[in-house]
Amino acid sequence: MAFTDLLDALGSMGRFQLNHTALLLLPCGLLACHNFLQNFTAAVPPHHCRGPANHTEASTNDSGAWLRATIPLDQLGAPEPCRRFTKPQWALLSPNSSIPGAATEGCKDGWVYNRSVFPSTIVMEWDLVCEARTLRDLAQSVYMAGVLVGAAVFGSLADRLGCKGPLVWSYLQLAASGAATAYFSSFSAYCVFRFLMGMTFSGIILNSVSLVVEWMPTRGRTVAGILLGYSFTLGQLILAGVAYLIRPWRCLQFAISAPFLIFFLYSWWLPESSRWLLLHGKSQLAVQNLQKVAAMNGRKEEGERLTKEVMSSYIQSEFASVCTSNSILDLFRTPAIRKVTCCLMVIWFSNSVAYYGLAMDLQKFGLSLYLVQALFGIINTPAMLVATATMIYVGRRATVASFLILAGLMVIANMFVPEGTQILCTAQAALGKGCLASSFICVYLFTGELYPTEIRQMGMGFASVHARLGGLTAPLVTTLGEYSTILPPVSFGATAILAGLAVCVLTETRNMPLVETIAAMERRVKEGSSKKHVEEKSEEISLQQLRASPLKETI
């Protein structure tokens, strides 16, 4: 008998599972706020050079005649953001006048920012514009680098230390580093603490998903995965609302970091994965956890009858060949695991490139930043409803592949939207982003089901590393737009379609119990191949019999 049978006996979908899932998914929702935070804290307001300090007019008028005389206009008739005249051009104050070839220079005395929407951002505070504009993208890349490092570190630690310890530490690290980011006043310190925050993103997501999935019965894993997606949707909507109410970037940074101190405090009462405890010889603690689960689910008597011997009868066949010392090579050692790993590398990387390419630069759509953020969050709800139905009734593989391919096609189609139609362009991009967000959540669940328990955390961490590489690559792909406007959408769309094709190679896991060991995984694949071969053989024999039967002559 399997461990899932033991969960069924103790109440597989009771009050414990509901409370446990809610407490783990709430922090995941707020992580979405941190992921997209720089859309607001690093927003670039309209700006232009400050006039020369040695002119008395500079202190009296930065918007009228003085502005027209000192700042050239760009092609759209707005003040040039990065250049100013070397000397005031008073002749420009005359109607319909122009001075072609007037000498200009950089913004030696700083910039004047429009603070009507954003009273303060890191761009204003450290002048991350013009020649320094790449530092803004660098800050986001540093955050994504932290997510990348965290995926490798926390994925490996969880296999050795369990899920609970790294999760508790991640909550504390995020609360502390988030507060420090809001406190320190240097750009270098900002980047350091954003890196530490990025690390916790992986630590929280990977361990939360594993704890939710491993305490869920087979029939509840799909719902748990979809709830994770809804928590991300809620987090994006919360970000839009909180950012609208709290405009200064330091206050906003602190406001979305402080709740993780509360998550840190209650996380001490979350139980460790009993699967992991059993695999690492801590059966007594596993029994105690299962007894608490049984009591909370109204199965106290069943829990009291649970002993090490009874538990071993459920799991003996599954854990007999478990080796608790695993390395990254185990992800490539056997054929079945190797195929899963290679496909997931492509899927996670490509999905991430397309997703962050759309979602991390909302100002390019030309609409209200708060409105676009809310729209990009709301669109996830119908996408998740469709994903829920298809994952339950159709399967994981078809759902993920369809969403990825559809998203890729929509991103490429956005190239053909006429200029000046911001609403149509934003709506189409939002639909593509909804498909990518849904596929991302489905892939988290799918990955956890594809890998066996003994290397599940390592596998999810390794796959997540490639997603973070994709997140690092997305800003670089965006810069290709300076050479050709078609390169970014073609790149994002093509990678999404490639990921969808890679999904088709994987095995369907709908309504299948979690595999505990690598050996069991190989046996399942071989048995599946043998069964398919037998079915094909049987079908071939039946067709041969049909051709030879008298019935054929009457058709």
UniProtKB/Swiss-Prot annotation:
Alphabetical UniProt keywords: Glycoprotein, Ion transport, Membrane, Transmembrane, Transmembrane helix, Transport
Subcellular location: Membrane
Biased amino acid composition, Basic and acidic residues: 526-540
Region called Disordered, residue ranges: 526-555
Disulfide bonds listed in the record: none
Cytoplasmic compartment residues: 1-23, 159-166, 216-225, 272-339, 395-397, 451-485
One BP annotation, GO: monoatomic ion transport
InterPro entries in UniProt: MFS_dom, MFS_sugar_transport-like, MFS_trans_sf
An annotated GO cellular component: membrane
Stretches of the chain found on the membrane's Extracellular side: 45-137, 188-194, 247-250, 361-373, 419-429, 507-555
Glycan attachment sites: 54, 114
Gene Ontology terms, MF aspect: transmembrane transporter activity
Residues annotated as transmembrane: 24-44, 138-158, 167-187, 195-215, 226-246, 251-271, 340-360, 374-394, 398-418, 430-450, 486-506
Membrane topology: Multi-pass membrane protein
Similarity-based family: Belongs to the major facilitator (TC 2.A.1) superfamily. Organic cation transporter (TC 2.A.1.19) family.
Function of the molecule: Organic anion transporter that mediates the uptake of estrone sulfate. Inhibited by probenecid, propionate, 2-methylbutyrate, 3-methylbutyrate, benzoate, heptanoate and 2-ethylhaxanoate. May act as an odorant transporter.
Protein name listed in UniProt: Solute carrier family 22 member 20
Provenance organism: Homo sapiens
